[in-house]
Amino acid sequence: ETTPEPREIKDFKASDISEQPFGWNVPNWLSRREISQALEAEPRVQFLPGVASTKLFTRDQEAKISLSNGTQVKARLVLGADGRSSEIRNQAGISVSTTRFGQKALAFAVTHPIPHQNVSTEIHRSGGPFTLVPLPDYQGQPSSAVVWMETGPNALALSNMPTEAFEAEMSARSCNHLGPL
């Protein structure tokens, strides 16, 4: 079996567009903690973690929102940050256009022998991108999160592979950029 070789390598440096980093990878738990603390400290925000909206009634000057804890709140601005199947968006009558690409994501974490140097790597091929996102070391080894986009049937086949075959396929798909995954 041959190892696929990348056809073309493009290095993107954030400094090409700014002296600031292009982005940061922030763990979800840290984002949630910091956002929660900031909201709790804001006197004009009523932060109700664990409480869902159940009904939205809008008028020109304000909206009335019924909550899962049995209360109601009034607001001049309602933000629907409740996911891709947003109930707030539906109740507000905001339509959505969806494009399906026939892809599924496999997401997991791996260790590897070559340090990632805090650099994300994305490899594009048919089926979708294969992305390595730096994570802190795990048990003394460099570690990365992987988001592997594939067509639905290929993603299913990959997820059903025996571990050894999957690891070989994963390392080949990464072009062994960080060594065997």
Task: Name each model feature, range by range.
Residues E1-Q91, T99-K104:
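Conserved N-terminal helical subregion
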Residues K64, V78-L181:
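Conserved FAD-binding catalytic core of PHBH/FMO-like flavoproteins
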